[in-house]
Amino acid sequence: FEPTEHESADANLALAERVFDECKKHDLLLLLEAVAFPYNGETKKDASFLDRKAETVIESARVLSRYCDIYKAEFPGTLGRESDQQLEDNLEALDASSERPWVLLSAGVDYDDYLDQVDMALHAGASGVLGGRAFWKEYFQQTDADGRRAFLTDVARKRLADVDAQVRENGSPWFTRYGFSAEDLGTVRAVEGWHFRY
């Protein structure tokens, strides 16, 4: 999603609104992910793309997050390119722009960088993570089945456990975005067999 690329942004916005309306109609949760993209011959490593990435991520959340139940956001900046203070400011702006609970995607960055991104995002208001490649991409570098199994069992499992511990300690509860407290949720009772109507 590129808010300044009006033709594609308008089409994507209309699609997001339509899909969210259908999900509400059928009582389905919608997770929406928007990613910044290079255009006009850029690559994701070009300064022109990197210069606008944070603003694209923040503005995308402002525009799109109302059309979902959970918003999946990119990290608004680049570790080592912007200062920690700038990245923290970007994350606070992302949090303020998102109308829904948001989680951080990994975009395939190296695990150590993702761990730093997760820490910063959780302290800025993220409710959790929805990462993939940062946890397991080295799996494909293993030369045999035993190596792949060992990687998943030892390395990937530990990574997931470490990030899970971070989320449990520092994540913002999703329900606070909707104005609820833990006490409010504690009063909710579901009728036995409620799920059969689905």
What kind of feature is each model-predicted range?
Residues 51, 157, 182-185:
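Low-complexity, intrinsically disordered regions enriched in charged/polar residues
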Residues 31-44, 103-104, 171-182:
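Aromatic-lined carbohydrate-recognition surfaces of secreted/lumenal glycan-active proteins
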Residues 170-198:
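C-terminal extensions of enzymes
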Residues 33, 71, 132:
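Conserved, mostly hydrophobic/aromatic
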Residues 3-21, 25-29, 37-100, 116-127:
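Alpha/beta enzyme core
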Residues 45, 136, 143-144, 185-189:
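Charge-rich, low-complexity amphipathic helices
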Residues 75-179:
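Catalytic-face loop-and-helix region of soluble metabolic enzyme cores
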